[in-house]
């Protein structure tokens, strides 16, 4: 079944009712766009806190300066959205797709973004402070000035430079842990690279992951053993 398609006029009316509901739930109605086709709609500056966009198709929507705090975007398609200065604080957006989105100076503080995708998105100066980014994908994303302080970045995929972004000490230790585990746990890298990685083992073994998986392991050709630092 195809997603319900809304006209801009219908969207405007639903947003107006939702904004009234935020002020007094007796007179308005909460917006429910779950599963809707909202491609290219204009929601700039609207207050849509706690609205439901679960599994909605919002490709190419205009969301600049809108407030989506505590909204539900689980499984939603937000590719190519224009959402600079938008607020997604404390929203649920697990498995959502923000590929190639323009999110400069957007806010995702405290948001749940597990397995969300930000491939080729512009996320410079975005705040992911205290967000859950477990297994999120930032491959080829444009970062810089991005705030990841106290965010859960376990198994996050990066392949571009992270210079200028904000990571706290615990997160740096986690990044070191996953790097050391990947390099030393296999035989695909050169001895030079393996020896270089050993120099940050003490940092890696301070990661929270050690409590769950143990210290960094290395493969010695026969079995995995606890990795040793370069003497």
PLM feature segments, named:
Residues 93, 230-231:
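C-terminal end-of-chain micro-motif
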Residues 162-230:
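C-terminal segments of enzyme domains that contribute to small-molecule binding surfaces
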């Amino acid at each position: 079944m195809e997603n319900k398609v809304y006209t801009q006029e219908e969207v405007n009316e639903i947003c107006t009712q939702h904004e009234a509901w935020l002020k007094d739930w007796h007179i308005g109605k909460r917006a429910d766009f779950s599963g809707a086709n909202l491609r290219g709609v204009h929601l700039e500056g609207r207050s849509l806190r706690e609205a439901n966009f679960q599994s909605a198709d919002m490709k190419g929507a205009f969301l600049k300066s809108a407030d989506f705090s505590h909204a539900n975007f689980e499984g939603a398609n937000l590719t190519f959205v224009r959402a600079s200065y938008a607020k997604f604080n404390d929203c649920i957006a697990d498995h959502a797709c923000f590929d190639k989105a323009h999110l400069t100076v957007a806010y995702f503080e405290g948001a749940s973004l597990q397995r969300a995708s930000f491939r080729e998105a512009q996320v410079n100066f975005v705040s992911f402070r205290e967000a859950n980014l477990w297994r999120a994908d930032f491959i080829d994303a444009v970062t810089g000035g991005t705030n990841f302080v106290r965010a859960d970045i376990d198994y996050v995929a990066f392949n571009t430079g992270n210079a200028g972004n904000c990571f706290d000490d615990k997160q740096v230790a986690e990044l070191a842990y996953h790097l050391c585990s990947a390099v030393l746990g296999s035989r695909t890298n050169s001895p030079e690279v393996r020896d270089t990685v050993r120099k940050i083992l003490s940092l890696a073994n301070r990661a929270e992951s050690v409590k769950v998986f143990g210290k960094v392991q290395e493969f010695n050709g026969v079995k995995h053993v606890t990795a040793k630092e370069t003497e």
